[in-house]
UniProtKB/Swiss-Prot annotation:
<protein>
    <recommendedName>
        <fullName>Calcitonin</fullName>
    </recommendedName>
</protein>
<comment type="function">
    <text>Calcitonin is a peptide hormone that causes a rapid but short-lived drop in the level of calcium and phosphate in blood by promoting the incorporation of those ions in the bones. Calcitonin function is mediated by the calcitonin receptor/CALCR and the CALCR-RAMP2 (AMYR2) receptor complex.</text>
</comment>
<comment type="similarity">
    <text>Belongs to the calcitonin family.</text>
</comment>
<dbReference type="InterPro" id="IPR001693">
    <property type="entry name" value="Calcitonin_peptide-like"/>
</dbReference>
<dbReference type="InterPro" id="IPR021118">
    <property type="entry name" value="Calcitonin"/>
</dbReference>
<dbReference type="GO" id="GO:0005576">
    <property type="term" value="C:extracellular region"/>
</dbReference>
<keyword id="KW-0964">Secreted</keyword>
<feature type="disulfide bond">
    <location>
        <begin position="1"/>
        <end position="7"/>
    </location>
</feature>
<keyword id="KW-0027">Amidation</keyword>
<dbReference type="GO" id="GO:0005179">
    <property type="term" value="F:hormone activity"/>
</dbReference>
<keyword id="KW-0372">Hormone</keyword>
<feature type="modified residue" description="Proline amide">
    <location>
        <position position="32"/>
    </location>
</feature>
<dbReference type="InterPro" id="IPR018360">
    <property type="entry name" value="Calcitonin_CS"/>
</dbReference>
<keyword id="KW-1015">Disulfide bond</keyword>
Length: 32
């Protein structure tokens, strides 16, 4: 990772996206 804050934000967004997907609603960009 070149930028720590970007790294953390990316990981956080991924978790957030997974959380919403499990909750039954899409959130954020689609990830494979």
């Amino acid at each position: 990772c070149s930028n720590l804050s970007t790294c953390v934000l990316s990981a956080y967004w991924k978790d957030l996206n997974n959380y919403h997907r499990f909750s039954g609603m899409g959130f954020g960009p689609e990830t494979p």
